[in-house]
């Protein structure tokens, strides 16, 4: 499990939103930064990507993923599969410790270093130390409210930040 991060994403129809907290923790006990940006727009603003794990590793993966998006003309699924293949096969990449959630208006995917590319059945994904709390909150909110994706991820992150010590309430939301 990756500490110091929570990312949650919700897709409803062609609307998608992703949120991440801002906390960066060094080791197990020291908060080094409160307002880190862990959710980004890629490929001319058409793709959202969020990471959990080592910051340096995540920047490497963002760059590799954006290169794959360019190579495959924005085809999210193809770019994700190719990144996962490289991540699994390349000796240097294999040592990177991170998870990614990527989304565009058509799909949302979770990408892991073990080569997994998973599309959630319900259009909801969460990763990181507070991921399970955010996932549970998002699912409950989707089922019981009419909130839009941006509001859903904001609320889910607030729940996670109130429970997980590695997740703060400095939440950044991006939406398509």
Swiss-Prot record:
EC annotation from Swiss-Prot or TrEMBL: 3.4.25.2
Pfam families: Proteasome (PF00227)
Sites where the protein binds Na(+): 161, 164, 167
Record keywords: Allosteric enzyme, Cytoplasm, Hydrolase, Metal-binding, Protease, Sodium, Threonine protease
InterPro entries, per database record: ATP-dep_Prtase_HsIV_su, Ntn_hydrolases_N, Proteasome_sua/b, Proteasome_suB-type
Enzyme class: hydrolase
Gene Ontology terms for molecular function: metal ion binding; threonine-type endopeptidase activity
Single biological process term from Gene Ontology: proteolysis involved in protein catabolic process
Catalytic reaction list: ATP-dependent cleavage of peptide bonds with broad specificity
Activity control: Allosterically activated by HslU binding.
Gene3D superfamilies membership: Glutamine Phosphoribosylpyrophosphate, subunit 1, domain 1 (3.60.20.10)
Gene Ontology cellular component terms for the protein in this record: HslUV protease complex; proteasome core complex
Subunit structure: A double ring-shaped homohexamer of HslV is capped on each side by a ring-shaped HslU homohexamer. The assembly of the HslU/HslV complex is dependent on binding of ATP.
NCBIfam families reported in the protein's UniProt record: ATP_dep_HslV, PRK05456.1
Family membership: Belongs to the peptidase T1B family. HslV subfamily.
Protein name: ATP-dependent protease subunit HslV
Lineage of origin: Bacteria, Bacillati, Bacillota, Clostridia, Eubacteriales
Gene behind the chain: hslV
